Amino acid sequence: MINISFPDGSIKQFAKNITAYEVANAISMSLAKAAMVAEINGELQDLSIVIDNDCKLRILTAKDPECLEIIRHDAAHLTAEAVKELFPETQVTIGPAIENGYYYDFARDKPFTTDDLAVIEAKMQELSQKNEQVTRELWDRDKAVEFFKSIGEHYKAEIIASIPAGEPITLYRQGNFIDLCRGPHAPSTGVVKHFKLMKVAGAYWRGDSRNEMLQRIYGTAWATKEQLDSYLLMLEEAEKRDHRKLGRELDLFHFQEEAQGMVFWHDKGWSIYNTIEQYIRKKIRKNGYTEVKTPVLVDKSLWEASGHWEKFRDDMFALETDDKTLALKPMNCPCHVQIFKQGIKSYRDLPLRMSEFGLCHRNEASGALHGLMRVRSLVQDDAHIFCAAEQITDETVSFCKLLTEVYKDFGFTDIKVKFSDRPEIRAGSNEVWDKAENALKEAVEQAGFNYTLNPGEGAFYGPKLEFVLTDAIGRQWQCGTLQMDFVLPERLDASYVAASGEKKRPVMLHRAILGSLERFIGILIEEYAGRFPLWLAPVQVAIATITSDLNDYALEVQKALIDNGIRTDFNISPDKINYKIREFSNQKIPMIAVIGKQEQENKQVAIRRLGTTDQEVLSVEQLIAVVKEENEKYL
């Protein structure tokens, strides 16, 4: 007999060589019917797994969050099965679960069309309703290679051939379809009920642009119809808020082929950019940061010394001049170390907080570029804190508080923290890592955050915090980071004189709040759906006259607003007032100042705020005071 421990703390005895499904059935038939996979000693397994030793067992159903990835992986196999039934000449390659869904890559001469997707989806529904049994099979590697070659699946054969000889190969069979997979999978295709195929895109075999182009079908799959409907509704809303669309409509920026991944900022977009920079500058000065500016083009010798040349060479723009190789900086940190090294630094100088709106360039693949979210030229709200080891906790707490203030001012209050600890390959002793990780954990807790652990995901040179925002439609955006670094000060020979008189290496904290200004503005456009708050809006007050004989007064009002630093626009054309109001509303201007005869006589304006039809009559001085008060909260 074996002892099986359950999540409720109970322990039950079963005969050896019992399957997880049989255990579930012994507990209750309803549990066995709903069961998808088993968690045995913390590892997910098929329900068909034979248990022959004492263990901890959890039976998982669609209600458990871990099963969402299983459903999506099952949906990927179901997609491939449907494609093979409909288009037998197609070769299958790989199909993993990803965030919010899955994809499967296919090799096929003829491109898949939108109509094809509808047919494939219908076939998937049919296969799901058949509730085909899914079985796991162990194969010899060489036999598996020969089998897949014999059925014309050369990509699959290539993958299997790359697996070391002697390793067992697991294949999963459902109906007439068989696929290489580690698993686990649910016991039948019927668990995949709530799904939708989204789009087709190109993808290179093995992600290498030198290889052939495949066709990638993206899909989404969920545990319930409500979850699927909610996700599709969110996508509809996201499409309306797409920053690329709103960027064009609101005349904020554009991109063009002659400068891929580089933003052409228009007047209104540049106003937002500068306002954010002004806001951040005020915050960092208040928090004891100095601001610096470092070169954009730097000799490769510095990048070699820092280690960036070895790791990021392919992502850097380089050029040859005067027998030298120069590179556009992809990040600011090595340049900040050069400033730190100017003159002797004492322990009394620490912590030294050095910030820069640093212009960086990264050679992103053209297919990866995506509006403001993924560009080649970007400005980071970057800063590096040079400190002693004993200052790490206090500096991290201060940073967390600053970051929280900033996010709150932009309307983000749901902030999640991910903590990435030591990877297998790393610099520094376990003792150094223990102290570093404990310092960050203590700081995060002091700052009032809970965190989720990303085991082994830290950089080789130190642990990391990532700060994730949730936007108005539930999407998550990783923006802020704090990365501890023991290595760069050593590589670039940065030091300070300790109280004892000995020379020590500072710890370097790389930190950013927004990430890049370009990406953060893209996030804000979508968060606000283009309706920027008054202090941030590119045009704060638009002036509209009812009749042309009021134009002189309108220009007086505009001058008074501009003289007080208020961003304005006006329409004194002969157009109807309703048309003017509608046009300014479409531009999402927060305040429209309507001027009629009565407003002129009383030196007033009638204010209509965006999204309302109510009007509030203010004197020009009162209007100026309202806007200035809002500006002064942030700027």
Curated annotation (Swiss-Prot):
SMART domains found in the cross-reference section = tRNA_SAD (SM00863)
Reaction(s) catalysed by this chain, per the record, are: tRNA(Thr) + L-threonine + ATP = L-threonyl-tRNA(Thr) + AMP + diphosphate + H(+)
The family database entries (CDD domains) matched by this protein are listed as:
TGS_ThrRS, ThrRS_anticodon, ThrRS_core
What are the annotated GO cellular component locations?
A: cytoplasm
Query: Does the keyword RNA-binding feature in the UniProt annotation?
Result: yes
Single biological process term from Gene Ontology: threonyl-tRNA aminoacylation
Q: Name one Pfam family in it.
A: tRNA_SAD
Q: Which UniProt keywords apply?
A: Aminoacyl-tRNA synthetase, ATP-binding, Cytoplasm, Ligase, Metal-binding, Nucleotide-binding, Protein biosynthesis, RNA-binding, tRNA-binding, Zinc
Binding residues for Zn(2+):
C333, H384, H510
Q: Name one GO molecular function term.
A: tRNA binding
Necessary cofactors: Zn(2+)
* Region Catalytic, annotated ranges: 242-533
- Extract the InterPro entries matched here: aa-tRNA-synt_IIb (IPR002314), aa-tRNA-synth_II (IPR006195), aa-tRNA-synth_II/BPL/LPL (IPR045864), Anticodon-bd (IPR004154), Anticodon-bd_dom_sf (IPR036621), Beta-grasp_dom_sf (IPR012675), TGS (IPR004095), TGS-like (IPR012676)
Please give the family membership noted in the entry. Belongs to the class-II aminoacyl-tRNA synthetase family.
Q: What does this protein do?
A: Catalyzes the attachment of threonine to tRNA(Thr) in a two-step reaction: L-threonine is first activated by ATP to form Thr-AMP and then transferred to the acceptor end of tRNA(Thr). Also edits incorrectly charged L-seryl-tRNA(Thr).
Q: What is this protein called?
A: Threonine--tRNA ligase
